[in-house]
């Protein structure tokens, strides 16, 4: 056991050789390096697999084990200040190591095919390997300084990958937005680290917790509360929590595989990791725990409402990620360490599955609509993909059901535990959390139904509002190029189906029924042909990671089933044994396992809410040929209600659309108020600097010049040195008498 821990420092270093080899290869022998570029995927996967083996070994040894501090190197500046670098292994570290390596391996295998035709293939794998190394270094850090160093490296890799196609203006803008937003959080994190060092005199976690608990008993908690909030500010930005969440949807401009790794399973979880790591510190400051839970509940509701009317499939999943991270943050604010960590595990695998599934969907749509994200990621142009990509559809459906909280899939067990814990803390928070669970089921099945049910909705004329049928493809370096598209794929839709697709949308396009019937007979035979011009299933190297993540989605939830079979029998709660001696900080004396009857009572309520959300999604977005559509429930509701109620329903739908389409008006507020105010302040500062500061300086010079000229004129000639001496003499006399008067 000690022998394994002794070499744990190797884990963060394993991905680095790939990054360094690609970098030196492109610098020294670029032609040879590019000629064997597809071979670089193998060492990337191999080295990360070795890291997975080490991580799994450490995780098994952590069951009922103790924490391990190991110092590798010390930098001593003087006798009073030194920095010690090493690694810290505990259950939280083990969880994150396994998450990063497993999801990272799946993403690297997937990316080999997804990025195979991209000119930046080598650059992509270099960035990904460096990100994996930075993230592994972050979670094994033994002190706050180490965390901050790797925190910045993780952020740098994120910016590089978000702006991977840097010639596209939208990608460059998204990269800048992510950088600026995270600068706010990172600056707060740095100030918080320095503040706690000033309080405790140490950066080490163990010393920090012990010293702060002793000092906390003496009172005067204002400054520690401020420092703790600054630390939490870093987590708010990195984990896309309100109000610093605005960068995450724009980050979808990067390649889809990075969304699965960085913006679902790992980097956005870095903020969660930081709060979980510092939770013993935060629990001594009640105000901070209240703030954490409040930010979490606001974020989970906001993310769900913003996802209700999104057209872009990746942005819908991004807002879903934001909402689910809000659930985890709420659990941490409640002090429910185990529930938060459990949902972190289950959500990471389910959301990675969904993001990789969305990449497979986009990959299948690109031959039809071109390589423009506005079209290939637009759910309005999808539909009926079940018959073309059945494997992707099955995996995406399982990931959707898991995120909705449907048993026995993974997210059901963890989300239900958070919902139960929220009742113990605040019924009002619990009501919001349960309501958001219903919204989650609604918008996730909205994504699924718009993508896979019905028929193919590719219709460029009606979508773009133009008369031509040309699309725009984005080249491998982001340059837009015109690309002709076969007009055969302007598939007609029935009126009922069109309404379902564009619910919460501004414009609903109507078609003549006679034209629709004529075109349907013409297009149906062609739709049954398996040609390259129709959506097609992805290659095996993209499907294998999906199938493996399905296995995790199906079974990873069973490690935390909070059930006990009876007195003296086996406790099924393996996660609690793994996390021992970590305790639930909300109620330390409570048991982690609950009775079977109580569990089913709690679970039935959450499952009922999720089922209701799915039912509503089928009503609004289901196929026009489904049994629910035959019931015509919408018209039934209109007949039962009055015309006034119908108008009110339309107004509500319009409000929901505007709220979601405008991102809750938060981006508009930042642009029109915050950004504009900063610009006006900058202009005022520039005016003050140019006309006041520079004016005073220039005025002194001008006055000196005219004074010299006046003296020269009065004296009537002579050597210039005499004039200067005469001038300075009177200045000194004036200053002397001025000081005497004071």
UniProtKB/Swiss-Prot annotation:
It is an enzyme of class 7 (translocase). It comes from Lemna minor (Common duckweed). Its EC number is 7.1.1.-. It comes from the Eukaryota. NDH is composed of at least 16 different subunits, 5 of which are encoded in the nucleus. It is a multi-pass membrane protein. Keywords: Chloroplast, Membrane, NAD, NADP, Plastid, Plastoquinone, Quinone, Thylakoid, Translocase, Transmembrane, Transmembrane helix, Transport. GO terms for cellular component: chloroplast thylakoid membrane. InterPro entries: NADH_UbQ_OxRdtase_chlpt_su5_C (IPR002128), NADHpl_OxRdtase_5_subgr (IPR018393), ND/Mrp_TM (IPR001750), NU5C-like (IPR003945), Proton_antipo_N (IPR001516). NDH shuttles electrons from NAD(P)H:plastoquinone, via FMN and iron-sulfur (Fe-S) centers, to quinones in the photosynthetic chain and possibly in a chloroplast respiratory chain. The immediate electron acceptor for the enzyme in this species is believed to be plastoquinone. Couples the redox reaction to proton translocation, and thus conserves the redox energy in a proton gradient. GO terms for biological process: ATP synthesis coupled electron transport; electron transport coupled proton transport. Pfam families: Proton_antipo_C, Proton_antipo_M, Proton_antipo_N. Belongs to the complex I subunit 5 family. It is found in: Plastid, Chloroplast thylakoid membrane. It catalyses: a plastoquinone + NADH + (n+1) H(+)(in) = a plastoquinol + NAD(+) + n H(+)(out); a plastoquinone + NADPH + (n+1) H(+)(in) = a plastoquinol + NADP(+) + n H(+)(out). The keyword Membrane applies. NCBIfam families: NDH_I_L, PRK06590.1. Gene3D superfamilies: 1.20.5.2700. The chain crosses the membrane at residues 9-29, 40-60, 89-109, 125-145, 147-167, 185-205, 228-248, 256-276, 288-308, 325-345, 352-372, 394-414, 423-443, 544-564, 599-619, 720-740. This is NAD(P)H-quinone oxidoreductase subunit 5, chloroplastic.
């Amino acid at each position: 056991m000690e022998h394994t821990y002794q070499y744990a420092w190797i884990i963060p270093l394993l991905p680095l050789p790939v990054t360094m080899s690609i970098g030196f290869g492109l610098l020294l022998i670029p032609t040879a390096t590019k000629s064997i570029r597809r071979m670089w995927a193998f060492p990337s996967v191999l080295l990360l697999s070795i890291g997975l083996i080490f991580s799994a070994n450490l995780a098994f040894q952590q069951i009922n084990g103790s924490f391990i501090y190991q110092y590798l190197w010390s930098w001593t500046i003087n006798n009073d200040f030194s920095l010690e670098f090493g690694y810290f292994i505990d259950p939280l570290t083990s969880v994150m190591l396994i998450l990063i390596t497993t999801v990272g391996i799946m993403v690297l295998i997937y990316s080999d095919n997804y990025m195979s035709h991209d000119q930046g293939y080598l650059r992509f794998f270099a960035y990904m390997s460096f990100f994996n190394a930075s993230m592994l270094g972050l979670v094994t850090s033994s002190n706050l300084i180490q965390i901050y160093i790797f925190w910045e490296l993780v952020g740098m890799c994120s910016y590089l990958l978000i702006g991977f196609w840097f010639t596209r203006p939208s990608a460059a803008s998204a990269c800048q937005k992510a950088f600026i937003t995270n600068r706010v959080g990172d600056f707060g994190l740095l100030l918080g680290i320095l503040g706690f060092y000033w309080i405790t005199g140490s950066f080490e976690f163990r010393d920090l917790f012990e010293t702060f608990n002793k000092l906390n008993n003496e009172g005067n908690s204002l400054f520690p509360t401020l420092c703790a909030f600054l630390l939490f500010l870093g987590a708010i930005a990195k984990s896309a929590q309100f109000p610093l969440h605005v960068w995450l949807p724009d980050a979808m401009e990067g390649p889809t595989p990075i969304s699965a790794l960085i913006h679902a399973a790992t980097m956005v979880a870095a903020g969660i990791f930081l709060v979980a790591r510092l939770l013993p510190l935060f629990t001594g400051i009640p105000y901070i725990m209240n703030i954490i839970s409040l930010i979490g509940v606001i974020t989970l509701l906001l993310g769900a409402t913003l996802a209700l009317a999104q057209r872009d499939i990746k942005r819908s999943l991004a807002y879903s990620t934001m909402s689910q991270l809000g659930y985890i943050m709420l659990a941490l604010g409640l002090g429910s360490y185990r529930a938060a960590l459990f949902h972190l595990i289950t959500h990471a695998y389910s959301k990675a599955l969904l993001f990789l599934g969305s990449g497979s969907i986009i990959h299948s749509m690109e031959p039809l609509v071109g390589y423009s994200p506005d079209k290939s990621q637009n759910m309005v142009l999808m539909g009926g993909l079940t018959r073309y990509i059945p494997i992707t559809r099955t995996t995406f459906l399982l990931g959707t059901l898991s995120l909705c909280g449907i048993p026995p899939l993974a997210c059901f067990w963890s989300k239900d535990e958070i919902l139960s814990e929220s009742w113990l803390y605040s019924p009002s928070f619990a009501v919001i959390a349960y309501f958001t669970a219903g919204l989650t089921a609604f918008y996730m099945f909205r994504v699924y139904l718009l993508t896979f049910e019905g028929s193919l909705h590719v219709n460029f004329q009606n979508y773009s509002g133009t008369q031509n049928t040309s699309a725009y493809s984005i080249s491998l370096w982001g340059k837009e190029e015109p690309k002709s598209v076969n007009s055969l794929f302007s598939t007609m839709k029935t009126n009922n189906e069109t309404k379902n697709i564009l619910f919460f949308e501004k414009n609903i396009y109507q078609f003549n029924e006679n034209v629709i019937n004529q075109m349907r007979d013409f297009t149906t035979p062609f739709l049954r042909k398996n040609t390259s011009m129709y959506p097609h299933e992805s290659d095996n190297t993209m499907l294998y990671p999906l199938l493996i993540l399905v296995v995790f989605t199906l079974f990873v939830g069973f490690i935390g089933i909070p059930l006990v079979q009876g007195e003296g029998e086996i406790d099924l709660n393996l996660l609690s044994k793994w996390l021992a001696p970590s305790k639930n900080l909300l109620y330390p004396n409570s048991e982690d396992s609950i009775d079977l009857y109580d569990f089913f009572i709690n679970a039935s309520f959450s499952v009922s809410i999720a089922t209701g959300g799915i039912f509503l999604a089928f009503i609004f977005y289901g196929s026009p040929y489904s049994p629910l559509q035959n019931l015509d429930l919408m018209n039934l509701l209109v007949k039962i209600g009055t015309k006034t109620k119908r108008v009110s329903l339309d107004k509500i739908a319009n409000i929901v659309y505007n709220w979601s389409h405008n991102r809750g008006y938060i981006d508009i507020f930042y642009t029109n108020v915050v950004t504009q105010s900063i610009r006006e302040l900058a202009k005022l500062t520039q005016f003050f600097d140019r006309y006041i500061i520079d004016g005073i300086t220039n005025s002194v010079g001008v006055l000196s010049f005219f004074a010299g000229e006046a003296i020269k004129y009065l004296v009537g000639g002579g050597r210039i040195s005499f004039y200067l001496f005469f001038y300075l003499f009177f200045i000194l006399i004036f200053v002397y008498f001025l000081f005497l008067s004071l």
